């Protein structure tokens, strides 16, 4: 098992809010790692996702606040990804520009990407290992 992974918003939201088997599986995968890495945009995506789940009735306000507090306690190394723009441009034909940031970072670091978005793996565009938890 690698000591570091890049984690995307979908997997992290699952880890923070899902009390079922999929959430447990992500938390289990992340346990014992030396480090988590992500593009700097993760902060914005997490807040947007959690508040969106409140608006959609999938989380209570209290659960969202707890999720943000739990997120803030995680040791995540945030990376600027503008330097990866050329790879992001290549990837954006197959995945969203947001997802391309995570893929390009995982490729640059030579570590797996942990996600709950199977479309990233199905795209076949990534040159890194993709671990899907859904």
Residue ranges and their predicted role:
Residues 1-42, 53-62, 118:
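Short, well-structured N-terminal submotif of metal-dependent ribonuclease cores
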Residues 10, 45, 101-104, 119:
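Active-site phosphate/pyrophosphate-handling residues
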Residues 35, 77, 129-131:
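Conserved beta-strand segments of alpha/beta enzyme cores
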Residues 41, 47-75, 87:
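Active-site-proximal, substrate-binding regions of enzyme catalytic domains
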Residues 74-116:
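Active-site neighborhoods of divalent-metal-dependent phosphate/nucleic-acid chemistry enzymes
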């Amino acid at each position: 098992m690698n000591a570091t992974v890049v984690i995307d918003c979908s997997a992290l939201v699952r880890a923070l809010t899902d009390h079922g088997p999929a959430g447990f599986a992500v938390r289990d995968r992340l346990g014992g790692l030396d480090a988590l890495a992500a593009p700097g945009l993760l902060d914005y995506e997490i807040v947007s996702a959690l508040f969106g789940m409140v608006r959609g009735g999938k989380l209570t306000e209290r659960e969202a606040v707890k999720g943000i507090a739990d997120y803030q306690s995680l040791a995540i190394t945030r990376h600027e990804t503008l330097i990866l723009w050329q790879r992001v441009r290549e990837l954006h034909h197959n995945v969203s520009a947001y997802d391309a940031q995570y893929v390009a970072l995982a490729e640059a670091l030579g570590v797996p990407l942990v996600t709950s978005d199977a479309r990233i793996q199905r795209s076949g565009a990534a040159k890194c290992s993709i671990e899907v938890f859904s």
